[in-house]
Amino acid sequence: EGIKATSIENAGKKAGYPIGPLALSDEVNIALVGKIRKQILKYDDNSSTGPWDKVIDQMVSKFNRIGKSQNSGFYEYPLGEKKYIWKALESHFPVSINQIPEKDIIERLIFSQILEAIYCYQDNIITSFKDANTGSILGLGFPKSSGGVLEYVNSYGPQNFNERCLELAKKYGKRFHPPKLLVQMAKTNTLFI
């Protein structure tokens, strides 16, 4: 979407994630991230392709930048030195004049994980409020200060969270559309327990 790489990384850190999303992609392996995305698109009706899919595909297939294990991904990893964002990144993926507000970047990062957790809770894949929160912090690196994915919704308020999801969906696509469970909770102002 033409967002500066530093803006993405800084937003992730401001949100409370241990590392930025691009650094995390490098740690995990960009090729693996691409394979996961393809599986999600194949089996999840709520997912849609976006500009990030092109970025992931080109990083792997065109530029052979797999991640930290190969010393080259979104970051460069010079031996014995501090990592830095790949200098050619913006020449291959130009930055847009119209930047997305930082608040939106932060909430898009956070809300995308929360919405996936709510779908899992709705479909009884996750059946415990405590497990959802603990798993999100320990397994996904979700910001600790939030208390976890479902506690975040409780703190934000189900009605407010639902409304913000609708705003994000209108601006950034259906992936932010609230799940049925959240819509029901917003109507009755019910909290996750």
Annotated model-derived regions:
Residues 1-193:
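N-terminal glycine-rich phosphate-binding loop for ADP-containing cofactors
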